[in-house]
């Protein structure tokens, strides 16, 4: 009576191993799902950044105001007879 129980327990363990720890097991599926969620969050962040950059490029292509603003703030350039006063923000 003892041998069939031992054989059955070993058989259950042998059949459960691939399900939990095998190549397509639950642990691997859980890990891939976690990686997928992290990648989706990264993609969403990058899409928002790209949208902002696209808007900035459109603004730079369409008008001179954005170019003038960049020239003032980044390069410190001014128009003739213009005084530019820049007050830095507190960090």
Swiss-Prot record:
How does this protein sit in the membrane?
Single-pass type II membrane protein
**Where does it reside?**
Cell inner membrane
Primary location class: membrane
Spans within the Periplasmic topological domain: 22-91
InterPro entries in the record, alphabetically?
Cell_div_FtsB, FtsL/DivIC
Q: Which GO terms describe its cellular component?
A: cell division site; cell septum; plasma membrane
Q: Which residues form a coiled coil?
A: 28-74
TM helices/strands, residue ranges: 4-21
Q: Which UniProt keywords apply?
A: Cell cycle, Cell division, Cell inner membrane, Cell membrane, Coiled coil, Membrane, Transmembrane, Transmembrane helix
Pfam families (UniProt xref): DivIC
List, in alphabetical order, the GO biological process terms annotated in this UniProt record: FtsZ-dependent cytokinesis
Instruction: Show which residues sit on the Cytoplasmic side of the membrane.
Output: 1-3
Its function, per the record, reads:
Essential cell division protein. May link together the upstream cell division proteins, which are predominantly cytoplasmic, with the downstream cell division proteins, which are predominantly periplasmic.
> What protein family is recorded?
Belongs to the FtsB family.
What is the annotated quaternary arrangement, including any partners?
Part of a complex composed of FtsB, FtsL and FtsQ.
According to UniProt, the name of this protein is Cell division protein FtsB
Q: Which gene encodes it?
A: ftsB
């Amino acid at each position: 009576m003892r041998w069939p129980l031992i054989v059955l327990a070993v058989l259950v363990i042998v059949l459960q191993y691939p399900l939990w720890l095998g190549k397509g097991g639950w642990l691997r599926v859980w890990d891939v799902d976690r990686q997928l969620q992290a990648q989706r969050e990264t993609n969403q962040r990058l899409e928002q950044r790209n949208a902002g950059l696209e808007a900035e490029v459109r603004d730079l292509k369409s008008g001179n105001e954005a170019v003038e603003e960049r020239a003032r703030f980044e390069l410190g350039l001014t128009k003739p007879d213009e005084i530019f006063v820049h007050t830095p923000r507190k960090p």
